[in-house]
Regions:
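Acidic-glycine-rich active-site phosphate/pyrophosphate-binding loop
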Residues: 40-54, 119, 134-145, 279, ...
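Fold-level recognition of mixed alpha/beta catalytic cores in primary-metabolism enzymes, strongest
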Residues: 56-59, 64-65, 69-175, 193, ...
Length: 354
């Protein structure tokens, strides 16, 4: 049978699912994915993005690669898992709102902390071309609100220009990025071998002849797992407090800068000799070694919060995710289905955990 529980959000309009096939009082292997997808607004799709279309050996739809293909392969294996007697349990963890900051998984973590035993390892099925990924970067995202004072643009010294102040912060973030690009730290196993800082949005001002009273920008840091990201954030906060705010508040003490954390999740760095790495590689017949990726996943959260060793491995390519005509190939799904079948055999035989 399947022992399952739904963990709803505050509105009860969406939920996480945690299910166990086998016994709930012994450690097992967790298969995890997120059920939400990114919007299709403004994208030039050639098929209905919310109707699955099979063409030329590929399946087209929003979320086909990221990451409903993996979830479909997992669910397709459930009848076989329930039919056979598993010596090692299988756990299925499906989350909501991963795409907007890994929000749903936090509630799932709360449930899992109450379980009698934790999974001994986890496979998160983000699209990796069925390659074994043992490490990924972490991410912190922020919204900065600059509160200035408006005035007629003919008398700019009577106001505090919020856009001008925000541009100073953008310049400082760019300076930090340039310093990291030159001095590191580096890890050449990543496509982008260093921590990156990126200003993605900025809005400010109401008219050309008005000194802008408000400016809002958003930036992110995608950091190597081993890098002290808190120090980077402290540098930015320190620059705001010591360089940017004093001249503003000399004109008007009610002006200032607020910084809000939008998203924060840790990086993943699973050792090459971890049991989960060896198991997944052996089931795939993988002799090419492991990978590291610059995008993030919930794997880092499961490891960081619960201590569950994890890898990322799933069908499809991240290059197809989040764009028009997203697809996953039939060949990739076949590889994932074969992996699930071999995993089931291993669960029936029993997996010896170190």
């Amino acid at each position: 049978g399947v022992d399952s529980e739904l963990v709803f959000d505050e509105t009860r309009s969406k939920a996480n699912l945690y299910a166990t096939i086998g016994t709930t009082d012994s450690p097992g292997v967790m298969l995890s994915g997120h059920t939400d997808v990114v919007p299709v607004d403004g994208q030039d799709w050639h098929t209905d993005p919310f109707s699955l279309v099979s063409r030329d050996g590929c399946f087209y739809a929003r979320g086909s690669a990221d990451m409903k293909g993996f979830i479909a392969c997992v669910l397709a294996q459930v009848p076989e898992m329930t039919r056979r007697s598993l010596r090692t349990s299988a756990h299925i963890a499906l989350s909501y709102d991963e795409e907007v900051g890994c929000l749903g998984v936090r509630r799932l973590i709360e449930l899992m902390t109450t379980l009698p035993v934790q999974p001994m390892m986890a496979v998160i099925g983000e699209p990796t071309g069925m390659q074994v990924v043992r490490a990924h970067k972490g991410k912190q995202a922020f919204r900065v609100t600059v509160r200035g004072r408006s005035s007629h643009s003919a008398y700019p010294t009577e106001g505090v220009n919020a856009v001008d102040t925000a541009s100073g912060l953008v310049a400082y973030i760019r300076q930090l990025q340039q310093n990291i690009r030159v001095h590191g730290p580096f890890d050449d196993a990543y496509t982008v071998p260093n921590t990156t800082l990126h200003v993605g949005t900025i809005q400010g001002g109401t008219a050309l002849n008005i000194v802008p009273e408000k400016c809002v920008l958003e930036f992110e840091i995608r950091h190597l797992p081993e890098q002290d990201v808190d120090r980077l954030v402290a540098d930015i906060r320190g620059h705001i407090a010591t360089v940017l705010e004093p001249p503003m508040q000399a004109v008007d003490p009610d002006t200032g800068i607020e910084i809000e954390v939008l998203t924060s999740y840790p990086g993943l760095s699973t050792q090459t000799d971890a049991a989960v790495v060896g198991l997944v590689q052996s089931l795939l017949g993988d002799t090419e070694g492991t990978q590291k990726i610059s995008f993030g996943s919930e794997a880092g959260i499961f490891t960081g919060e619960l201590g569950i060793p994890a890898v990322v491995c799933g069908p499809g390519s991240i290059q197809q995710a989040h764009r028009a005509d997203e697809y996953v190939s039939e060949e990739q799904l076949d590889r994932c289905i074969r992996f699930m079948s071999k995993l089931t055999d291993s669960l029936v035989d029993g997996i010896a955990f170190p």
